[in-house]
Amino acid sequence: MAPVSPTDFPQQCHGAVVGLGGNIGPVLDNLQGAIAELALVAGIEVERCSSWYRSRAFGPPQPDYINGCVTLRVSLSPPELLQTLLAIEQKFGRIRLEKWGPRTLDLDLIFYGDRQLEQARLTIPHPQMQYRPFVLVPLAEIAPDWVDPRSGKTIIQLIEQVDCTAVWPVAPGLELGGSLEPEQVFAPGAVAVHG
């Protein structure tokens, strides 16, 4: 695919999906804090948040992950949105040492409207999302009819193709309505998840 620059995307709103996850530290506090940070960014409106789900980690032995998804309305370009996500990860102590290693916070840009994009640092839709029940299960909760532009399949159709038995709900999602204030989202220690 041809390189894309931020100027290739006009300043209009697009739907986007971000997957959130983590498995070390105060995971739910970090996930909810990340949503609060997203809500503070000009050009981002948080629309819906899924419930939180526990799943086994890939890679080396490590704690289970807690994952969820949010739908957004954004006027940022895909590269700008990616930079925002990386900055929020850093703010919550994300250190990139090993692939599939433990992390305080992981934010993945899953969809950006119906766009397909392939760059060195960004591929949209996320190249592995259709194989990941920890993405598909929460996404089916909040956007079951979202269509993967690569396959033409809805999230519901994609979820039927993966084994979801190792994904368990652990906490309700955030109730979002009207304009989102950070204090509505982030109440440290408000929800505890026990092993």
From Swiss-Prot:
One MF annotation (Gene Ontology) recorded for this entry: ATP binding
Ranges in a coiled coil: none
Keywords: ATP-binding, Folate biosynthesis, Kinase, Nucleotide-binding, Transferase
Superkingdom: Bacteria
EC number: 2.7.6.3
Annotated catalysed reactions: 6-hydroxymethyl-7,8-dihydropterin + ATP = (7,8-dihydropterin-6-yl)methyl diphosphate + AMP + H(+)
Keyword ATP-binding: yes
InterPro entries: Hppk (IPR000550), Hppk_sf (IPR035907)
Biological pathway: Cofactor biosynthesis; tetrahydrofolate biosynthesis; 2-amino-4-hydroxy-6-hydroxymethyl-7,8-dihydropteridine diphosphate from 7,8-dihydroneopterin triphosphate: step 4/4
GO biological process: folic acid biosynthetic process; tetrahydrofolate biosynthetic process
Task performed by this protein: Catalyzes the transfer of pyrophosphate from adenosine triphosphate (ATP) to 6-hydroxymethyl-7,8-dihydropterin, an enzymatic step in folate biosynthesis pathway.
NCBIfam families, A to Z: folK
Family: Belongs to the HPPK family.
Name assigned to this protein: 2-amino-4-hydroxy-6-hydroxymethyldihydropteridine pyrophosphokinase
Lineage: Bacteria, Bacillati, Cyanobacteriota, Cyanophyceae, Synechococcales
